[in-house]
Each structure stands twice: as C-alpha cells, then as structure tokens.
Amino acid sequence: DPYFSGDPSVSNVEETTDSIYVQTEWDFEVSDYYVQVNAGLRYEETEVPSTAEVRVPIQVNWVAAGEWITVFQEGVEEQDFTGKYDVLLPMFDVKVDVTDDIVARFSWGKSITRAPIGFLQGGRSFSGSPKIGSRVVSEGSTDLKPYESTNLDLSFEWYYDEASYASVGLFRKSVKNYIDTQGRLETFDGLNDIYQGPRWQEAVSALQAEGIQATDSNIYDYFREAGYADADGVVEPNSDDPLIEWNVVKPRNLDDSKTVEGIELAVQHTFGETGFGFGANATLVDGDVEYDPYNLEQQNPLVGISDSANFQVFYEKEGLSVKVTYAWRSDY
C-alpha cells in the first residue's frame, strides 16, 4: 500500500509527581466561642514524559473526484516530549460553634485537576483521507498545566432538632488554565496543496470558458485529460502548489480565568420517632457563561453551569429504609 505503511502513530505518556505537605490543627476558645482551625500547605512537582512513534507525511495526492490520500514515509519516527510544572496549594479551614445548635464554617484554599491523559500524549497525527474542508491534524501537549481553582466557602448550619437541620452556604471558585481544543490553521513545509494551485486555477478557467460548471468532478476529469494524473488517475502535488492549510487541533491552556459563584440551601426534617422525614436542597449558581454570537473573536464560556434542586421523602426505622427522590436541573 503506497499510502499507508502499516505502522500507526502510537504514543505513551507518564505522570510522575513528587510532593511534600505540612498540616496543623488548633482548638481554642475566643470569647466563649469554640473554634477549630485546620491549615496546610502542599507543594507538588510533576514531570510528564511522552514517547511517540509518529507516521511522517510526505505529500497529499488527489486520487478521485472526492478522495484525497495522505502518503506517509515507510515505518515510523520516534519522538520524545517532556513537560514539567509545579504547584503550591494552601488550605485554611475554620469552624466556629456560634451556639450549641449553630455552626459557622469558613474555607479558603487552592486545588488542581490534572489535564485528561489523552491530551498529554506527544506526537502529531495527520488525517489519512484529507478531503477539502476536512484536513485535520491532531496533537497532544505535555506542556499542559492542570486546572487550578481558588476556592472560597462560607456556610451556616442550624441543628434545631435531633437528625434535623437547615443550612445555607455561599461559594466562589475562580479557575485558571482552562483547556482550549479549538483548531488553528497551520501549514507544514513540503505538504503542498493541489487545491487552488496553478493547475487547479487553470482547470477552473478552462471549464468556465466552455460554460461548464467547475465542480470537483469536472476539475478532476480535466486534470486527467490534461495529463496531470498518472495511469491510475493519481494526481501528485508539485512545488508550484501552495502549502496545505491544516486545521491543527492541539489542547492549549487559556490565559484568562473563569469564575463560578452561588448559594446552596439545604434542610432535613424528621418527625420525631416515627422514622418519617424529608430533605430538600437547592444550588443557585452563576458564572462566566455568556456567549455573544455577534462577537467574531474566540470565546470560551463555561458549559454545564446550571441551577439544581432535589427533594426527598424517606422512612428509616428498624432496619427498613424507603426513599423517594425528585431531582431538577435548569437549562444550560
């Protein structure tokens, strides 16, 4: 097979993390209020090596009116990639017993979520059938940083009866290093494009002069009649053709940060010793979710952000547990 060597692009990736942390706890009273403080600091250093066996493209041939084929070198080329990052993650929690029944909590800290492992794989993969409008290159990146969130929470809890309580909480999360996977147009030396090259333009002009519509099929037939194709109907690019513009899909960290904030409400009530009770909770959330269809610049609004609520009635007594739950979520 002149177009596929039989060796697919293969990549391996690892994550090696070294970390150290310190943590401390204090219990004390301030003006008859019992206070608990938990504080900590964690440092992590992560290395991301990746080895890829990559098929290297030579050229893109036009083999039929609607079919284009990427020609690759025989065998594969081994490529090594290495990424590295470090993070400092502080944490500070405070719990205050305001009364015997009311508890206040405050929390501030940073947390991370690592990039999906598939995004970290090194190497570059060209589509094997790059039709016009579908010329895609997929790349990973070992340089991706993890999502980093700064979290702020404040809540009050009222335990007004045994197994019964009500609570309200405020939260705010500011997340940076969001990953963008939108494609960008790039060219690569040596990969020339028959489409819109001099011979293509020649075919379009000749067909239009004869009153024939310049469809891909008619242009391909012109190429064959003009001797631009070999005996098998394969048209190869030449140095006069422009470089192909590939849609390169490569994950990248965004420079801006996104914010999510909201309020959480919850209540649970039990009816004495009967075993019957109910619970309800709601989360009202807002964030950077706006998208302007008239703005031509690239936009990256948060997705999946919505209000939600749950309601449950239950019976729990003498080893028997029965629950009926209703869940609701708004549009997003």
Which role does the model predict for each range below?
Residues 1, 169, 176-181:
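Outer-membrane beta-barrel proteins and related beta-barrel translocases across Gram-negative bacteria
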Residues 49-56, 117-123, 130-132, 179-185, ...:
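Outer-membrane beta-barrel translocator domains and adjoining extracellular loop/strand segments
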Residues 172-174, 190-332:
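Gram-negative outer-membrane beta-barrel transporters
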